[in-house]
Amino acid sequence: MTIRLWHCKGARSLRPLWALEEMGLDYDLKVLPFPPRAHQREYLQLNPLGTVPFMVDGETQMTESTGICHYLVEKYERQQFGLQPDHPEYGDYLNWLYHSDATLTFPQTLYLRYGMMEPDERKQPQVAEDYRKWYLARLQRLNGHILDREFLCDGRFTIADIAIGYALYLGEKIGIARDYEPQTQAYLERLKARPGFVREAEKE
């Protein structure tokens, strides 16, 4: 049975879309207008949250972008894109996966909402600026970690790079990347040059 993924351009669903391309898995892509809960109300019948990503694989339904990436590695035995529990960097690998959304993407979404997406009368410039600074402060662990590394874990590309890479890419799309440290910007450029990322971008 074919994996089905619902996606919006530039949204967190980019993570599993990128992972699918890197892993060479067959899938059916449904691209929706953003936000789908407002512009495609019938989507709520499939996913009551109205969010993307939404992935269906047989009886499995998932809505969390990094969780889907983790599922794909384990379900389809694409261990070259992940680390196993007996690996010495396994804890760090999991930490980067969770760090990507809970620590990095969260403040970005508030910056995006209150600085860019709300009508002018509802914009909150100070709130947006506070969350911009919060996001940049939360990059400190990554800034130090990537100084002498090409990728986050085990000297090779994994879904941890997809998870963190999307957060950096979103920062670029919403104008925060001008404050990235040079090594972090260089890391993002390496990720964007990957064939899987290029193919993903062509399908958006």
Question: Where do the language-model regions lie?
Answer:
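Short, solvent-exposed turn/loop segments enriched in Gly/Ser/Thr/Pro and often Arg
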Residues: P33, I159, E204
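Phosphate-coordinating loops and pocket residues in cytosolic domains that bind phosphorylated ligands
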Residues: Q45, A193, E202
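GST-like domain detector, emphasizing the conserved glutathione-binding G-site
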Residues: M1-Q126
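Residue-level recognition of oxygen-bearing side chains
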Residues: G67, Q183, G196
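GST-like fold's C-terminal all-alpha helical module
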Residues: L97-A193
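Short, flexible loop/turn segments with low-complexity composition
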Residues: P85, R199-E204
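Active-site-flanking alpha-helical
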Residues: V73, A167-L168, A201
